[in-house]
């Protein structure tokens, strides 16, 4: 892969790695394209069951690379196609786990909450830091965050732009696991291997139904749930 993105595979687990240390893994246009391509390839790979998204060099992702604005490497912003951060509009058929170390802020937070689960290091910080610079959330932050943590907690984070530590993130449901510093990738890959060992068709159907039910009347959501089962 290119654009500061690389992919490593271990059996059924695919790890997608953001590697732009000079920008704290902030995502520019080429990095967004690299992330999109990596997850597109993962979803099409029959040998891959679960993915992990991790930021190298001690930081998950500092958001979009604001220094790229106005240059050929700026993030594309369109209402259709890939999201500005890359995969944020993709609905994959298989789970993705975010392995969060350091900072997952602004667009980096949006990437983390695009994932199905989040394994967060004890000293990590998550937040809508783009509030400080007058930059809006455009990769699903205003949609997914309230679904994860509730309207009131999401509004607190979105309006204030304050940082949330791992303990608070776990208490509000933003973090699924809290692990020692330096262990996010390893622990996320171990969790991914556990998921990969489970019967896949049933797990993927239940995951899809859980994603699809938002906004549907209960009866329609339950009908869709049943429609995924081969009777």
Where do the PLM segments sit?
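C-terminal long alpha-helix characteristic of the crotonase
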Residues: 21, 119-124, 175-227
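Short, active-site-adjacent cap segments at secondary-structure transitions
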Residues: 58-62, 67, 105, 127
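Hydrophobic/aromatic residues within transmembrane alpha-helices
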Residues: 16, 53, 65, 111-113, ...
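An acidic, glycine-rich surface segment that forms the CoA-thioester-binding/catalytic face
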Residues: 32-36, 40, 44, 50, ...
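CoA-thioester-processing core
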Residues: 85-93, 99, 105-159, 172, ...
């Amino acid at each position: 892969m290119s654009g500061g993105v690389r992919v490593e595979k271990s059996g059924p687990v695919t790890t997608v790695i953001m590697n732009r240390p000079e920008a704290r893994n902030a995502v520019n246009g080429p990095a967004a394209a690299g992330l999109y391509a990596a997850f597109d390839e993962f979803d099409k790979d029959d040998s891959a069951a679960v993915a992990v998204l991790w930021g190298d060099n001690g930081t998950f992702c500092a958001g979009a690379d604001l220094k790229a604005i106005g240059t050929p490497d700026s993030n594309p912003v369109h209402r259709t196609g890939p999201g500005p951060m890359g995969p944020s509009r993709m609905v994959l058929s298989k789970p993705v786990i975010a392995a969060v170390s350091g900072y997952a802020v602004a667009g980096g937070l949006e990437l983390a909450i695009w994932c199905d689960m989040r394994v967060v290091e004890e000293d990590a910080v998550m937040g809508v830091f783009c509030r400080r610079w007058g930059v809006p959330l455009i990769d699903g932050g205003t949609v997914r965050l309230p679904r994860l943590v509730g309207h009131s907690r999401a509004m607190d984070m979105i309006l204030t732009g304050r940082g949330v530590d791992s303990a608070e993130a776990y208490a509000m449901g933003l973090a699924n696991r809290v692990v020692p510093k330096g262990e996010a990738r390893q622990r996320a890959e171990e969790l991914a291997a556990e998921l990969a060992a489970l019967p896949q068709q049933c797990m993927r159907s239940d995951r899809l139904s859980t994603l699809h039910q938002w906004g549907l009347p209960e009866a329609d959501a339950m009908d869709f749930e049943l429609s995924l089962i081969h009777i």
